[in-house]
């Protein structure tokens, strides 16, 4: 593959004052270090953390955003990835730690992205950039850390658990929820672990299509009790993407008599659950790359070479599943207005207007909707 003409500056969505986000022109390109790749962004997916993190930890002038898909246009040193070194022209998708106070130009909401070689995926020839971004590597990383590190769920994709266990994935119609359902089913022998989930009745068929075994209406006043009954008072594992008072109450009350583990993907109130037999943990997907998080309080995490080693192997496992078409993507809604639509999409998420869809913004009309196969013809 030939070389690409790379500008000295580009456009990016940066943090403004008070946690706001602004479109900035003529921003210097990210600086590549060892193990980095420069990616020309074709599409990005939007996540709630993309507006929540800048609001909670504002750093004016810093980059923002996590999920991306695009084309490798420049290489840092040591760019080895499972399957061989990355090359100029490779199609790539992944997640980076956006709004990172320790790395100002780390963020996906930009024309060019600084990706980490060992924490990125190759896009299969049959997949478009929008579809790749819509798989939401940010959610893949977060759910992986939640299920297999925080909850310590038995089984792996390569060696599924022989005994099926009940697992509650709250909010199965969310993008992270639908990924969680599929991961639970893929790590149990034959039919997988038994996945319980919640959502609105209008989305029951959707979550069942991802493999959910039983679905409950989260608005039902007896939701927790119904889950307890369905799991014979033996539920031990619960993932809560929202960490709200109501969602935490349902999850922790659904856990059986013997207790278990609860993983929240958002900060939760400790006093909502007083059950000493339920171990509670705030899970952050950004720790998968092993660097420490110095955000203060419960958001602080130490540097962990062990987590980094696990994360590298996790990415290899996910790549094999993606290549084998084992993941069914979440329904995506593509916005084609570039950075303006990026801001509007984040506002839509903030207003909670999106249900059972993943918002993806196309940044490069020339490659929108194209696969590697279609560009070769």
From Swiss-Prot:
Segments for region (Enoyl reductase (ER) domain): 18-361
- Pfam families, A to Z: ADH_N
Keywords carried by this UniProt record: NADP, Nucleotide-binding, Oxidoreductase
Q: What happens when the gene is disrupted?
A: Abolishes the production of chaetoglobosin A and 20-dihyrochaetoglobosin A.
Q: What induces it?
A: Expression is positively regulated by the cluster-specific transcription factor cheR that binds directly to an asymmetric direct repeat present in the promoter.
Classification via InterPro entries: ADH-like_N, GroES-like_sf, NAD(P)-bd_dom_sf, PKS_ER, Trans-enoyl_RdTase-like
Q: In which pathway does it act?
A: Secondary metabolite biosynthesis
Tell me which CDD domains the record gives.
Answer: enoyl_reductase_like
The cysteines joined by S-S bonds are none
Query: In which domain of life is the source organism classified?
Result: Eukaryota
Residues annotated as binding NADP(+) are: 49-52, 173-176, 200-203, 218, 265-266, 283, 354-355
Q: Record's family?
A: Belongs to the zinc-containing alcohol dehydrogenase family.
Name the record gives this protein? Enoyl reductase cheB
Q: What's the encoding gene here?
A: cheB
